[in-house]
């Protein structure tokens, strides 16, 4: 029974997608590169805020002068604000292209990650008053 069903799908000559001319005509290497970039970016978007606060809480507290308990409170506030913006973000995703939203979010994540990097260099590279 399963073989007949699979054979029926194999014998169909209709394409699954009604493709526009040239839309699906990109090389396999470019497809895999795009998938890799999207997967890496999606992972980084969720990891950066939590990784910086959980893994480097003591280092961030020492560099910024903020108590570790306050950093935990900031992480809680980040989670609540993120939760509140999920619904408007979904509404926005229905009206703006996914490529534009992904580009903006990756740019913002890059700026925040670079800021984390600069915070970590405070006192090592820059001469700061005591």
Curated annotation (Swiss-Prot):
Cellular localisation: Cell membrane
Originating organism: Mycoplasma pneumoniae (strain ATCC 29342 / M129 / Subtype 1)
TM annotation in the entry: 34-54, 73-93, 107-127
Membrane topology field: Multi-pass membrane protein
Name of the protein: Uncharacterized protein MPN_112
Assigned GO CC terms: plasma membrane
Gene3D superfamilies: MFS general substrate transporter like domains
Keywords, in A-Z order: Cell membrane, Membrane, Transmembrane, Transmembrane helix
């Amino acid at each position: 029974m399963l073989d007949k069903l699979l054979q029926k799908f194999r014998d169909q000559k209709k394409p699954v997608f009604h493709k526009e001319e040239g839309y699906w005509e990109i090389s396999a290497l470019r497809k895999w590169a795009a998938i890799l970039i999207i997967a890496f970016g999606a992972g980084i978007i969720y990891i950066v805020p939590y990784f910086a606060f959980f893994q480097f809480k003591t280092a961030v507290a020492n560099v910024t002068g903020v108590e570790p308990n306050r950093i935990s409170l900031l992480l809680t506030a980040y989670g609540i604000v993120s939760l509140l913006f999920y619904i408007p973000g979904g509404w926005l995703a229905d009206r703006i292209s996914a490529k534009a939203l992904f580009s903006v979010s990756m740019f913002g994540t890059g700026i925040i990650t670079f800021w984390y990097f600069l915070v970590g260099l405070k006192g090592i590279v820059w001469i700061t008053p005591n």
